[in-house]
């Protein structure tokens, strides 16, 4: 029998699959299932679900509740037992990119990519970056290619 935690991990993987195929509505739908779960959900799973949902909301352009969701995610991060600086950097990044013009967004993505590159060398931060490939997504925005292309590159390197 599969316990609830493993179902929620499956939902996150399904949400990530939908994100990769640009089906952002279903990304958010499956993410919401995790957030609305009544059980005892691990906070790292909840945090990374929220980040994937922010990525989907940003990409889709259906961002009516984007700012509120960023605020709720920051509030959640502050309540986490052991949040790292990277957790707050990620949320702050989403906070600042939404209201910028495309040129300023491109600059913000480049700056954040550099920050993520440094963070990926840190043992603790590396673990955080393994849940959701935000680094790959940011890199795809910098290079102006689909995130799937970045994922394919990473798979070839392994």
Question: What annotation goes with each model-predicted range?
Answer:
Residues 6, 12-16, 20, 48-52, ...:
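"A position-specific structural signal for the A-helix of alpha-solenoid helical repeats
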Residues 1-11, 39-50, 80-90, 122-129:
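Alpha-solenoid helical repeat architecture
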Residues 31-32, 50, 70, 89-92:
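Short acidic (Asp/Glu) and glycine-rich catalytic loops that position anionic groups and cofactors
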Residues 35-42, 53-60:
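Short secondary-structure capping micro-motifs at structural edges
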Residues 1, 29-39, 71-82, 114-117:
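Amphipathic alpha-helical segments of tetratricopeptide repeats
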Residues 77-158:
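Long, ordered, amphipathic alpha-helical scaffolds
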């Amino acid at each position: 029998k599969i316990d609830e935690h493993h179902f929620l991990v499956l939902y996150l993987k399904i949400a990530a699959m939908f994100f990769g195929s640009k089906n952002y509505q279903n990304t958010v739908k499956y993410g919401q299932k995790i957030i609305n779960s009544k059980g005892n959900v691990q906070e790292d799973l909840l945090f990374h679900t929220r980040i994937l949902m922010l990525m989907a909301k940003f990409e889709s352009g259906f961002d009516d509740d984007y700012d509120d969701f960023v605020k709720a995610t920051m509030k959640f991060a502050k309540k986490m037992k052991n949040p790292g600086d990277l957790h707050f950097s990620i949320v702050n990044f989403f906070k600042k990119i939404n209201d910028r013009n495309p040129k300023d967004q491109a600059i913000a993505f480049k700056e954040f990519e550099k920050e993520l590159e440094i963070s990926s060398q840190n043992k603790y931060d590396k673990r955080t970056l393994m849940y959701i490939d935000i680094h790959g997504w940011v890199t795809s925005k910098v290079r102006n290619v689909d995130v799937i292309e970045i994922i394919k590159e990473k798979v070839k390197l392994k």
